[in-house]
């Protein structure tokens, strides 16, 4: 994309306070004219440097730190100080910085969030604000909000209930909305709904920043969520995107089903994970040379991620011509009690859909040997669940077994890339949820494991939805997104073991996703932004956030010389 000219931005701020506004601050990149006219001359050292040099300075500071948690704090402090520079740093090397601002480091940051909290980066709305949520929203300084990421902190990554400390997730997620998708950060709002926590360690921690009582559940919880959705949509408009993040299984599906046709909303753990997993499967099919409807897919896990993927796989198989009933027969799920089969006790409605006539089995190794899947997908956050025997069996059943260890963070991965490639002698088609280093095999080949990161999905979806004012987001959007992502994977990438485009191309991938969403939205009469733009790519691209510093001096321009004459005498 061509670099844009600096945007002119009006501000009444002057002096010291301007240097404390992260939206306006340029640090040492302020020109001499700006320093003098904005009354900040003398507050900064006399050196004037470019943003490129500023990025280099941050990277050098970043690299001298010894822990990822300290690197996370460095970047968050930068975000609080100079927003443009923060995003310029992230975009300079997305592959390097994404694991710090999001998975896996954000998991550690959430565990330590009571220590990491510096200043407000979003809104904390507690159950005790019920009846006054509209007033709490008024505390946020921005009047125009187009995207909200909200969590109640009950199921943070694979770490469980972190309560109020889960705020690190919406903050990190929205940072990627901008870095990877170009959504304007000033139009993004992270929100944590604090209804308490079941985490005993947090309840006893004197430094914990959230409510110190058990989670509120039932009708009171539902009424609280209803009020929040109504208040947010009322204040920011029905087109405001509200993304649900890291809600527990008991709430995730029912809240999605409850709100999806009433508000502009989606659940990334269900739909985003599904989209990126299906994108990986579609890319893998170019290696196996067969169709998705030819696969037998076994899931280790039957929570929101597994069920979300399963439903989208069914939709993709239907698109290939298979009936929904026959597509479901090709999908098997394993939860904490074993294989999901008909007649098994205490199956939820969501799990019942994928229950088949089969004997009950509990051991995953035995289940793999019995089902003989062509694709094995782990989303249960059980580290090491894919044992050496399971990997050997997958390689015995299949010439090119598809093995996805998608659980986060790294410690929860079902197997490592090295284990998978070594045991299967490089025949496995592997993807993971967290990043793994390249693996060199005994035969000299080096394979680059694909990272099935949701950040391939949600930034582009958000950009497209916001750009055209899509009122509701159905599952078709996520199948379309999966197809677009898989199309960006070249044959060379596949030969290297990659099932996803390189992360350093993610902004371009997000643009393609957004353009496709916008095209479909106008074609299906679902867009609300009019008049319809003729060139959809130009339209979307023009709305993407630029890290170029804004021009904040007043607009100065000349008048004709004759009208500038100074009158010195009173006309007689």
From Swiss-Prot:
Keyword Cytoplasm attached: yes
Superkingdom of this protein's organism: Eukaryota
One matching Pfam family: Malic_M
Lineage of the organism: Eukaryota, Metazoa, Chordata, Craniata, Vertebrata
Keywords: Acetylation, Cytoplasm, Metal-binding, NADP, Oxidoreductase, Phosphoprotein
Provenance organism: Mus musculus (Mouse)
GO-annotated biological processes: malate metabolic process; NADH metabolic process; NADP metabolic process; protein homotetramerization; regulation of NADP metabolic process; response to hormone
Cofactor note: Divalent metal cations. Prefers magnesium or manganese.
Protein name, per record: NADP-dependent malic enzyme
